[in-house]
Amino acid sequence: MSLQFNSIALLLVSLILLGVLGNNSSITISATILLLMQQTFLAKYIPFMERYGVNIGIIVLTIGVLSPIVSGKVQLPNWTALIHWKMFLAMAVGVLVAWFGGRGVNLMGTQPSLLTGLLVGTILGVAFLGGVPVGPLIAAGILSLFIGKTG
C-alpha cells in the first residue's frame, strides 16, 4: 500500500485538524474516515458514498431525531399544544429549514467546491462563536439564497 500525497489528502488532513481545533467531532470523524478510505483498498467504495452518502446520513439523522419520541423520553403534545402559536411557529421554522436543506442538497450537487468553504465556516463558527454544527446542507441552502443558484 502506498500513501497518496495529493491536494485531496491535504484537504482532508486540514479538515481533521480544524475539526479537532474547533471541537467538531462530526467533521473530524468524517474527514478521518474519508482519508482512510482514500488511502486504502476502501477507495473503491468512495463512489458509493458520493452517490448515497447524503441519503444515508439523512436517514440516520432522522432516526436520531425520532428515537426520543419512540423511547418515550419526549412525549407527543396534546391537541391544545398543537394549536398554540409557538407550535405553529415551530412548524413554520421546520418547513423553512427543510426547504433550506433541499436547496442545499441541490447547490452542493451542482457546486460541490463550495462545500469546503461551508465546512470551514461551520468549524470557525463552532470554535470561535460558540455555535453548534447544524450541518452544511442548511448552510448551503442559505448560501443558495445569496448566490441565487440551486441547480
Swiss-Prot record:
Gene Ontology cellular-component annotations: plasma membrane
Membrane topology qualifier: Multi-pass membrane protein
Record flagged with keyword Membrane: yes
Top-level taxon of the source organism: Bacteria
Pfam families in the record: DUF441 (PF04284)
Keywords recorded for this protein, A-Z: Cell membrane, Membrane, Transmembrane, Transmembrane helix
PANTHER family: UPF0756 MEMBRANE PROTEIN YEAL
Name of this protein: UPF0756 membrane protein HSM_1471
Protein's organism: Histophilus somni (strain 2336)
